[in-house]
């Protein structure tokens, strides 16, 4: 399994934006589409401290949060070191 996991739904524009940033960074990730999959959505929520919105992004076991959080890390210069660790 890749060290980056992103929980998504097929129609979520924020999910697409987060995946685009990760692709731009040249990293591979595991995408778990929770569309119509309540068991996977519950597992995502449990792993994301109760958050139910998508995307939910994990780098290794660190919960990064959603799309805005990912872009905030990038703007702050903290995403590349996190991806390289």
What are these regions (language model features)?
Residues 1-28:
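Local sequence-structure signature of Cys/Sec-based thiol-disulfide redox active-site neighborhoods
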Residues 49-58, 68:
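Structural micro-motif
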Residues 20-22, 45, 71-73:
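Short, glycine/charged-enriched secondary-structure capping and boundary segments
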Residues 34-52, 78-85:
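Thioredoxin-like thiol-disulfide oxidoreductase module
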Residues 16, 39, 65:
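Residues that form or flank phosphate/diphosphate-binding pockets in enzymes
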Residues 59-85:
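Non-catalytic, surface beta->alpha helical segment in thiol-disulfide oxidoreductase systems
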């Amino acid at each position: 399994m890749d060290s980056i996991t992103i929980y998504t739904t097929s129609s979520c524009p924020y999910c697409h934006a987060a995946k685009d940033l990760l692709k731009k960074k040249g990293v591979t990730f595991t995408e778990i589409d929770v569309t119509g999959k309540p068991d996977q959505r519950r597992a995502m929520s449990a792993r994301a401290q109760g958050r139910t919105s998508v995307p939910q992004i994990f780098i290794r076991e660190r919960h990064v949060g959603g799309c805005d959080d990912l872009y905030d890390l990038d703007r702050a210069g903290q995403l590349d070191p996190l991806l390289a660790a």
